[in-house]
């Protein structure tokens, strides 16, 4: 699996809350930073020759199932992004299970406040594409490093208040930064 389970800010927030660990404590052993499409983003650490998720127990079962990342919640579904939105797709060759039953995506993904979750997922995806465009257009290594670390620090490492709604906090941070990004792009 390698670094294929890329984490978004909600995933890291859920892991931090569920495991009662700070983001820095998670980065010290359970998650790692890696480059994904030019962006430096956290992903679940994999171990051993088989590159197994650190959260799989000895029986191969997920030990963080109730607060597992969105990528894990989605599998074997995927998302196809187009025109500022996305559609769910079924990756039929990814799942070994042969007896499949119909289930609503909302139930499968099993996340509270599904409408806000889908908005967040879409907004985060397109924000990263905007960041990626800046990274690919620049040859300034300092700008590339600083922009990547800015995203990591502002959206992952900066603590979210566990007593407040995640989405409210995310959009308070992202709105400010997205507006600054748009202003800079128009200069």
Model-derived regions, located:
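Hydrophobic scaffolds flanking metal-cofactor catalytic centers in soluble metalloenzymes
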Residues: 1-134, 158-159
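Conserved small/polar residues in nucleotide/adenosyl-binding loops
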Residues: 176-185
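Nucleic-acid 5′ end/cap handling module spanning
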Residues: 170
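Long, charge-rich alpha-helical interaction segments
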Residues: 143-151
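Terminal transmembrane helix and immediately flanking juxtamembrane interfaces
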Residues: 155-164
């Amino acid at each position: 699996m390698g670094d294929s389970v890329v984490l978004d800010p909600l995933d890291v927030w859920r892991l931090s809350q569920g495991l009662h660990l700070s983001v820095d404590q998670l980065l010290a052993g359970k998650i790692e930073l890696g480059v994904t499409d030019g962006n430096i983003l956290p992903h679940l650490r994999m171990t051993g020759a088989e590159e197994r998720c650190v959260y799989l127990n000895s029986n191969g079962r997920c030990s963080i199932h109730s607060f597992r990342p969105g990528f894990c919640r989605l599998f074997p579904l995927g998302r196809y992004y187009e025109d500022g939105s996305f559609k769910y797709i079924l990756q039929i060759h990814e799942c070994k299970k042969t007896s499949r039953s119909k289930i609503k995506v909302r139930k499968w993904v099993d996340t509270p406040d599904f409408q806000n979750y889908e908005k967040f997922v879409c907004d985060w995806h397109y924000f990263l594409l905007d960041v990626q465009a800046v990274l690919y257009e620049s040859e300034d290594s300092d700008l590339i490093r600083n922009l990547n670390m800015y995203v990591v620090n502002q959206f992952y490492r900066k603590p979210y208040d566990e007593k407040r709604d995640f989405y409210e906090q995310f959009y308070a941070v992202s709105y400010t930064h997205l507006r600054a990004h748009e202003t800079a792009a128009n200069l």
